């Protein structure tokens, strides 16, 4: 089975969106791929959530970049989601022979990734990419957890709102 390594960090104060959407993608793909999640200093909540989806490997803050690269054999797909992963770091992953997917909502750096996912309504011309980079832009690419993916299947009664107070 093909391997996918997911790399995202979060703390008690920042980054949970990156962690949650990347874990949502792992959950979508876990039946068809051998998924492993890599993160720095996971909280007990993160550990609990990752254990529901796939194996995980905690990384040390001081050496996380080099440590993650040391796991790569070159046959993996790597998914990065963090503002701090630079173009040089992307290049290091690509030089290992891996396919690379970057989840982005800033478009503030050059991408050497094979695929860039941005679920916002974004102009592709705002991205600096390699000629081979495929851009996956717009709501169709939103990485949602299973409960939110199932919402459209729930029957709703249309109720007419007759009175409303706006403050």
Give the positions of each predicted feature.
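Extreme N-terminal starter segment of soluble prokaryotic enzymes
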Residues: 1-5
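A nucleotide-sugar donor-handling region in carbohydrate enzymes
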Residues: 113-167
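Active-site and donor-binding regions of nucleotide-sugar-utilizing enzymes
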Residues: 7, 11-16, 21-28, 39-131, ...
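Short helix-loop-beta junction
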Residues: 31-32
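Conserved beta-strand positions in the Rossmann-like core of class I SAM-dependent methyltransferases
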Residues: 36
């Amino acid at each position: 089975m093909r391997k996918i390594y997911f790399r995202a960090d979060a703390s008690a104060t920042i980054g949970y969106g990156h962690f949650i959407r990347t874990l949502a993608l792992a959950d979508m793909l876990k039946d068809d791929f051998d998924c492993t999640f890599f993160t720095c200093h996971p909280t007990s909540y993160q550990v609990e959530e990752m254990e529901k989806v796939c194996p995980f490997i905690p990384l040390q803050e001081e050496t996380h970049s080099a440590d993650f690269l040391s796991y790569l054999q070159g046959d993996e797909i790597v998914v990065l989601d963090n503002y701090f992963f630079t173009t040089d770091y992307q290049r290091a992953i690509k030089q290992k022979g891996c396919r690379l997917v970057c989840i982005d909502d800033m478009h503030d750096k050059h991408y050497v990734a094979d695929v860039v996912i941005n679920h916002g309504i974004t102009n592709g011309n705002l991205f600096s990419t390699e000629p081979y980079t495929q851009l996956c832009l717009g709501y169709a690419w939103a990485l949602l957890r299973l409960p939110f993916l199932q919402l459209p299947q729930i029957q709703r009664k249309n109720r007419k709102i007759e009175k409303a107070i706006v403050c």
